């Protein structure tokens, strides 16, 4: 038996302060009290079992709050592992994952202290022997009966890639924050008998994870008391498939919560009464180490929404509630400031002499994740029932977005001179960039602010027409850290655009020809925020995160998009690329293209007839250079790629403005040219034909027009806006396939079709799908480390006893810190719910995530996956940027 941790003396006042701070944060972060209505669309428990088990049962819920920490010794973590399930597949390469025992010994010093504190400070009352410092569900917490024959669980662990977790116990003579939490937890267990909702009771039920820098390790070893995780409802079983057997697919299974004697690792709160409230928007906070707020997502989005509604009311002469909105804004800002203060206080409690870091706090479905990047603190509050590693990845992107606006060296210098520096003033006007990123992370529809300004409106009877501009594929780029180029089926068009964007050679520079910009880094052509083509220097690669942050900055800034409304507008902006040069700045040249103006289809005051037109904010050329004085050179080069139409062409197009509504569309340029050739008017030259049109255009312009015709073709139009994915799963003819995401590991690019209904139209279904994708991705990349005896590839089924797991992972010094390698990761993983099945399949060349019909059999799933990979391989040149240009 492992020895219980030593009990340290505590201060009652310090316990009260810590309890009050945590209680305020949990109360402020919870959207509303939840009812006990069961909703089967949320996952609850992930189970290790064979393929034949595919039962989905309702789960009981609980509002119990659990306590865990990452400072246990490796021996304690190993000794707490319980018996694993005996059922394994014949194709498994390792034994089933053992279940960790999280209940502490009843003879721990914390229990004795709790009893002493209860006798001294709490009035006498009825007690329950079953209530102790444990995360077992209480009988009164369940809203529905549970089935003990079907109630099991599996360890679902947190990622350790960003912040290495602690190994070993830190013992100090001073008051330790973890000891404080243990003592408060023990006392609250005794107080729970009287059903009192005190501050100490709330803190005792918090699930806290922390990491200590004193014992940091690069290994992926985890504490068994904190790495377990319950999935959202309706999911089915997992086991590892043999690397050589593609048909051996793992499967997860949904079970009820455990009865008395079974170990429930994490309780889930009751489902909300309305299905729409299942996935409320995550709340993201960025604050300084001094506690000053820098960015608060829900407050910024609310202000943005109020401004949009105010503009609408002003146009409709209905601005009668301005005072009410201002009061709501003040109350929201005050509440957000209070929450930021509580977060800063909680982080400070754990920032003791050992430099411990608070990682996350869990209460049922509510998860509060922390990311400390001095001098900034980033916090995310979510109730999507997902993994902390997913939220930490989101917070990392927000931090990198800050670094892209203010370099890391400048950030350190500012806060080094003034620790209470207000960074929000320096970042004023960039809220739209963060809002655009948060909307993608939350899978929300993106509002077209240009339409609110009257640039993209259809005034028919005074009713505004809202264009669908949301690209759901942008959500996949973040959790897979890969770019998704636009699919182009026109032969050689991508290569032609790449050749047209080749920078001029340095020797060719003259008075009539442009020079090559100094320190040229990247040249990009983007459509709707998606990469069309890319050029880079030879022997130099570009990180996809840098390009994602760059395109997010361009598409998310209202000022940049407003400036790009004119063909003559050119934007020159400094930025930092965190993965390329985080301590310095580069400069980006942005020019939005307006192909409609090249063929003369625009006129002042004209309406946007036809939905197939590309607007000026959808197509852009971006040039990144390290020379801050290169703007004139870059401007001259890009301007030489876009020729202006002749004067007589502009005059004649105004006379033909009253032709058919589709005459001004790019895809009808051929018809327009033929019609113009037959229309001869006295005193005026004929409108140029297609040959004359091509005579004054550059090669770049002609290729751009071909691209626009392709993107605005009737088969590529979705809900009134160009569809950048350009294909659906229905076009592939694979029965049962609803959606997929394919990541090519060689090119670090991905492809995915457009979301079908109900995922595209219903936010609940869409967010559930993305949550399942992230959970499968986490389980594949961060499984429980296998024992040394099962790390070798084997096709036979073996069942090792718990002692084998102890001796293999923690028993020998050589394997005291087991590492996860590509051989020990899961190859396939299946999650099944009432609505869909999600399959994750990882190999060396690719990663594939499928959304399939829940009634599909395992053999049909394997057939769909194999057929899909063959189709992607045959269309690789259309889906990916295979031959990136270089100079």
UniProtKB/Swiss-Prot annotation:
UniProt-annotated location(s): Endosome, Multivesicular body membrane; Prevacuolar compartment membrane; Vacuole membrane
Keywords per UniProt: Autophagy, Endosome, Membrane, Protein transport, Transport, Vacuole
GO (cellular component) term, any one: multivesicular body membrane
InterPro entries: FUZ/MON1/HPS1_longin_1, FUZ/MON1/HPS1_longin_2, FUZ/MON1/HPS1_longin_3, Mon1
Major localization class: membrane
Chain residue ranges for the region called Disordered: 67-150, 191-280, 298-338, 784-806
Chain intervals with Polar residues compositional bias: 81-95
Biased composition (Basic residues): 301-315
Bias kind Basic and acidic residues: ranges: 254-265
Family under the similarity heading: Belongs to the MON1/SAND family.
Protein known as: Vacuolar fusion protein MON1
Organism: Mycosarcoma maydis (Corn smut fungus)
């Amino acid at each position: 038996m492992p020895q219980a941790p030593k009990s340290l003396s505590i201060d009652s006042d310090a316990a009260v302060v810590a309890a009050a701070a945590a209680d305020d944060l949990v109360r402020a972060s919870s959207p509303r009290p939840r009812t006990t209505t069961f909703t089967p669309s949320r996952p609850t428990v992930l189970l290790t079992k064979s393929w034949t088990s595919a039962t989905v049962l309702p789960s009981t819920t609980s509002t119990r709050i659990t306590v865990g920490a990452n400072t246990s010794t490796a021996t304690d973590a190993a000794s707490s592992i319980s018996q694993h399930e005996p059922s394994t597949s014949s194709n498994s390469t390792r034994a089933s994952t053992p279940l960790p025992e999280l209940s502490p010994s009843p003879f721990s010093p914390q229990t004795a202290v709790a009893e002493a504190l209860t006798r001294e400070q709490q009035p006498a009352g009825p007690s329950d022997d079953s209530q102790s410092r444990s995360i077992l569900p209480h009988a009164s917490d369940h809203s529905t009966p549970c089935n003990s024959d079907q109630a099991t669980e599996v360890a679902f662990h947190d990622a350790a890639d960003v912040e290495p977790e602690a190994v070993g116990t830190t013992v100090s003579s001073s008051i330790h924050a973890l000891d404080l939490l243990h003592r408060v937890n023990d006392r609250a267990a005794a107080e729970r008998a009287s059903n009192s909702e005190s501050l100490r009771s709330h803190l005792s039920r918090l699930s806290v994870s922390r990491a200590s820098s004193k014992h940091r390790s690069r290994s992926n070893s985890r504490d068994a008391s904190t790495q377990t995780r319950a999935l959202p409802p309706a999911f089915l079983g997992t086991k590892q498939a043999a690397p050589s057997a593609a048909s051996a697919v793992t499967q997860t299974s949904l079970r009820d919560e455990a009865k008395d004697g079974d170990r429930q690792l994490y309780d889930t709160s009751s489902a909300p009464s309305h299905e729409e409230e299942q996935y409320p928007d995550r709340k993201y906070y960025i604050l300084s180490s001094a506690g000053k707020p820098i960015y608060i997502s829900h407050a910024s989005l609310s202000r943005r929404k109020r401004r949009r509604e105010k503009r609408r009311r002003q146009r409709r002469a209905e601005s009668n509630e301005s005072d009410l909105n201002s009061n709501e804004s003040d109350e929201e800002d005050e509440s957000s400031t209070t929450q930021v203060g509580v977060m800063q206080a909680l982080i400070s409690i754990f920032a003791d002499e050992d430099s411990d870091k608070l990682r996350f706090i869990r209460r049922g479905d509510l998860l509060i994740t922390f990311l400390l990047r001095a001098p900034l603190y980033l916090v995310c509050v979510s109730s999507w029932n997902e993994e902390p590693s997913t939220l930490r990845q989101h917070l990392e992107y927000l931090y990198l977005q800050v670094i892209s606006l203010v370099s890391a060296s400048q950030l350190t210098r500012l806060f080094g001179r003034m620790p209470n520096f207000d960074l929000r003033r320096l970042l004023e006007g960039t809220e739209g960039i963060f809002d655009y990123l948060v909307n993608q992370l939350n899978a929300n529809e993106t509002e077209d602010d240009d339409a609110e300004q009257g640039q993209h409106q259809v005034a028919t009877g005074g009713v505004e027409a809202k264009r669908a501009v949301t690209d759901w594929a942008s959500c996949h780029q973040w959790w897979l850290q890969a770019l998704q180029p636009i699919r182009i089926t026109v032969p050689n068009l991508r290569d032609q655009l790449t050749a047209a964007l080749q920078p001029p050679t340095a020797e060719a520079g003259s008075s009539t020809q442009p020079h090559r910009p100094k320190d040229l880094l990247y040249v990009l052509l983007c459509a709707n925020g998606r990469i069309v083509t890319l050029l880079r220097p030879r022997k130099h690669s570009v990180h996809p995160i840098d390009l994602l942050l760059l395109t997010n900055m361009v598409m998310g800034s209202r000022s940049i998009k407003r400036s790009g409304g004119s063909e003559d507008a050119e934007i020159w902006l400094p930025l930092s690329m965190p993965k390329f040069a985080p301590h310095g700045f580069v400069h980006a040249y942005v020019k939005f293209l307006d192909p409609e103006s090249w063929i003369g289809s625009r006129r002042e005051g004209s309406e946007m007839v036809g939905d197939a037109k590309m607007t000026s904010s959808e197509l852009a050329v971006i040039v990144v250079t390290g020379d801050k004085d290169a703007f004139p050179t870059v401007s001259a080069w890009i301007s030489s790629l876009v020729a202006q139409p002749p004067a007589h062409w502009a005059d004649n197009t105004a006379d033909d403005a009253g032709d058919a509504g589709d005459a001004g569309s790019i895809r009808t340029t051929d018809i327009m040219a033929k019609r113009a050739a037959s229309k001869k008017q006295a005193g005026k030259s004929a409108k140029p034909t297609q040959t004359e049109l091509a005579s004054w255009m550059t090669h770049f312009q002609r290729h751009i027009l071909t691209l626009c015709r392709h993107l605005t073709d009737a088969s590529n139009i979705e809900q009134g806006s160009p569809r950048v994915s350009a294909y659906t799963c229905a076009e592939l003819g694979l029965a049962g396939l609803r959606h997929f995401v394919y990541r090519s590991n060689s090119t670090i690019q991905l492809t995915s079709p457009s979301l079908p209904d109900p995922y595209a139209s219903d936010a609940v279904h869409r967010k559930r799908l993305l949550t399942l994708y992230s959970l499968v991705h986490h389980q594949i990349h961060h499984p429980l480390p296998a024992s040394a005896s099962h790390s070798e590839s084997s096709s036979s089924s073996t069942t090792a006893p718990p002692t084998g797991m102890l001796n293999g992972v923690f028993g020998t010094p050589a394997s005291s810190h087991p590492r996860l390698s590509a051989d020990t990761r899961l190859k396939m993983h299946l999650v099944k719910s009432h609505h869909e099945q999600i399959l994750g399949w990882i190999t060396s060349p690719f990663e594939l995530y499928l959304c399939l019909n829940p009634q599909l059999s395992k053999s049909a799933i394997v057939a769909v996956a194999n057929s899909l990979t063959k189709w992607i391989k045959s269309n690789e040149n259309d889906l990916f940027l295979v031959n990136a240009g270089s100079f």
